[in-house]
Amino acid sequence: MQQLQNIIETAFERRAEITPTNADTVTREAVNQVIALLDSGALRVAEKIDGQWVTHQWLKKAVLLSFRINDNQVIEGAESRYFDKVPMKFADYDEARFQKEGFRVVPPAAVRQGAFIARNTVLMPSYVNIGAYVDEGTMVDTWATVGSCAQIGKNVHLSGGVGIGGVLEPLQANPTIIEDNCFIGARSEVVEGVIVEEGSVISMGVYIGQSTRIYDRETGEIHYGHVPAGSVVVSGNLPSKDGKYSLYCAVIVKKVDAKTRGKVGINELLRTID
């Protein structure tokens, strides 16, 4: 694995010179191997180690290099044709392979090669980009988007129209992460490497980036870049220092534990916010 990483790191330093016509065999094979390992879930761009999320930057570099070494090609699918550098994940799947891997894909959901989809996942008409990792038991609802290299945990619900930001465009240092047992409400956006910690509930229409103030109304604390575990979050506003205007923020209205979540439905958690 170290040799593979060294090849990727070296090639990335001269990425501006690499084109589909001049990419050398060693680099091409290394990039293709990494994409295959990401596709199978054997590797992932980010993982939790000793309680902390660690981003493997060299894997992200391999994803970026794949756009340098591959030319556009005609892609068949959904009774249409496409023209892109990245093949579709399910292009060569037959019924036996779908049965073996154990997830559902509703047309016209699109998943790029290099994204991992775990067992018991349901993909409604949605989009999952290269390098993403979607863990077991997750629902990606209609028109939801899982961005490049984003990490989605177990038993997550991404509601209709949710956007989970990627790292490729614009280039971000770390992927956006939604931990296990989270609910992301319809049309919400979580981007720029924000981490939504385990068991959190994000209401409909909440937008969170690195500069978004995440205000805990019980403690008065303001968080940036992460939603603490077990938070129930709605959209809100905070006043300016001079009191002349207010600016958007996300508000943590309560904290819940797994026991409470097990007894109370998601809708009930969001309705009783006073």
Swiss-Prot record:
Q: Which reaction does it catalyse?
A: (S)-2,3,4,5-tetrahydrodipicolinate + succinyl-CoA + H2O = (S)-2-succinylamino-6-oxoheptanedioate + CoA
Q: Which gene encodes it?
A: dapD
Q: Which HAMAP family match?
A: DapD (MF_00811)
User: By its UniProt entry, which SUPFAM superfamilies does this protein fall under?
Assistant: Trimeric LpxA-like enzymes (SSF51161)
Top-level taxon of the source organism: Bacteria
What protein am I looking at? 2,3,4,5-tetrahydropyridine-2,6-dicarboxylate N-succinyltransferase
Query: Subunit composition?
Result: Homotrimer.
Q: Is Transmembrane helix one of the keywords UniProt gives this record? A: no
Which residues are substrate-binding? Answer: 104, 141
Query: What is the native source organism of this protein?
Result: Shigella boydii serotype 4 (strain Sb227)
Enzyme Commission number: 2.3.1.117
